[in-house]
Design a protein with these regions (language model features):
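A short acidic, glycine-rich active-site loop
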Residues: 39-52
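A structural preference for short, pocket-lining loop segments at secondary-structure junctions
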Residues: 1-42, 60-70, 89, 93-97
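C-terminal long alpha-helix characteristic of the crotonase
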Residues: 8, 91-96, 147-195, 199, ...
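CoA-thioester-processing core
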Residues: 57-63, 71, 77-131, 143-144, ...
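A general structural signal for well-ordered alpha-helical segments in protein cores
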Residues: 34, 54, 114, 123-126, ...
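Acidic, divalent-metal-coordinating active-site segment for phosphoryl/phosphodiester hydrolysis
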Residues: 134-140
Length: 214
């Protein structure tokens, strides 16, 4: 269902910002069910069935044209933090802990975390989090750049909505262009990235938002 919902959100121009949060207050997402993992391993189908599906969904979250905010309102482990990495911003409750515990069952973050985490916090911090598999505090997560903001647990969702409302007031075409541009130029040589950005802004200048803004 989430897979289909993401397709709908992508096509809906009336949706200007997306906030992801957990149901209830105990967890944003505690990751995969270890018993379920054991069954997949026994069948030899873990990669083809579970991780491919999960990676596809996470890629869709990352590729959403709208700005995205993860409101980490409870414990966030494994696949949960991998999902949060796909968002543009992460707001975390001060009592929440996050971690990548996969090493404890002879695995590693297989739903994109191995790729996305080093790009966000650097190789050394990523290795530390994945090697030791320890849960870290919200303050530590913010210190290393894993999350963008820490606030009291009971304010996480309201703060995320506040940020979303601020973004929703801005020109949506410009926000989409900035998001797409940053993602696309990340791996380009500087000069190629500059040329790309010139083309992007030329297209942006032809939009209704730009005509009204200028």
């Amino acid at each position: 269902r989430l897979d289909e919902l993401l397709d709908e959100i992508t096509e809906d121009r009336t949706i200007r910002v997306v906030v992801l949060t957990g149901a209830g207050e105990k967890a944003f997402s505690a990751g995969a069910d270890i018993k379920e993992f054991a069954e997949f391993v026994k069948k030899g189908t873990m990669v083809s069935e579970k991780l491919h599906l999960e990676c596809n969904v996470f890629n869709k979250v990352e590729d959403l044209p709208q700005p995205t905010i993860a409101a980490l309102n409870g414990i966030t482990l494994g696949g949960g933090i991998e999902l949060a990495l796909c968002c543009d911003f992460r707001i975390m409750g001060e009592c929440v802990k996050v971690g990548f515990p996969e090493i404890g069952i002879c695995l590693f973050p297989g739903s994109g975390g191995l790729v996305r985490l080093p790009r966000l916090v650097g190789k050394t911090r990523a290795k530390e989090l994945m090697f030791f598999g320890e849960k870290i505090t919200a303050q530590r997560a913010m210190e290393i750049g894993l999350v963008d903001e820490v606030c009291p647990n009971e304010q996480v969702l309201s703060r995320a909505i506040e940020r979303a409302e601020s973004l929703a007031k801005l020109p949506s075409d410009s926000l989409r262009a900035v998001k797409r541009g940053i993602q696309d130029v990340a791996e380009m040589p500087i000069q190629q990235g500059v040329e790309y950005s010139l083309g992007l802004i030329s297209r942006l200048l032809s939009t209704e938002d730009a005509r009204e803004g200028v």
